[in-house]
């Protein structure tokens, strides 16, 4: 293993670099989630789910990335797949158990003229589709884990 970080980075496959970028995105999402959930964390247990998952993804995913060729890829795939569950639960909780109605509400805003709120006060409810960010991170991560390249050696 290279001791120089630049050499180490250059030795990584494209897939490993993509996973590293996704983990960086998860770090930013964790910081944003902590800020956005600051009040609700004291009110309900399920507000902790995305923070716990993002922290697990960073710590477990970072360790797994270092062992990419020795089982780390499979661990990362499982962690990224878990993101789909967390995203779905988040949409469920953000919508108060009525995801279809809230998704319809989000999509119907395209019919509103710019500058109008459609009768919904900004900040009066959690953003229904925000948890789908975990679907995006999970999708990119899974593609990187399941796409084989010549540099991966497996």
Where are these regions (language model features)?
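Transmembrane alpha-helix entry/boundary detector in multi-pass membrane proteins
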Residues: 14-15, 33-57
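Cytosolic juxtamembrane helix and N-cap/initiation of the first transmembrane helix
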Residues: 1-23, 147-148
């Amino acid at each position: 293993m290279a001791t120089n970080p630049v050499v180490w980075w250059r030795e990584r496959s494209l897939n490993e670099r993509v996973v590293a970028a996704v983990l960086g995105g998860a770090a930013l999402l964790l910081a944003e989630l902590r800020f956005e959930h600051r009040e609700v964390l004291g009110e309900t247990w399920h507000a902790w789910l995305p923070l716990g998952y993002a922290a697990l993804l960073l710590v477990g995913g970072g360790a797994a990335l270092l062992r990419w060729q020795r089982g780390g890829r499979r661990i990362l795939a499982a962690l990224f797949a878990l993101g789909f569950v967390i995203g779905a639960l988040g949409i469920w909780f953000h919508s108060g158990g009525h995801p279809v109605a809230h998704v319809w509400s989000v999509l119907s805003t395209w019919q509103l003229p710019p500058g109008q709120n459609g009768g919904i006060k900004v900040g009066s409810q959690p953003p229904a589709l925000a948890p789908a960010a975990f679907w995006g991170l999970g999708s990119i991560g899974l593609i990187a884990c399941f796409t084989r390249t010549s540099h991966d050696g497996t």
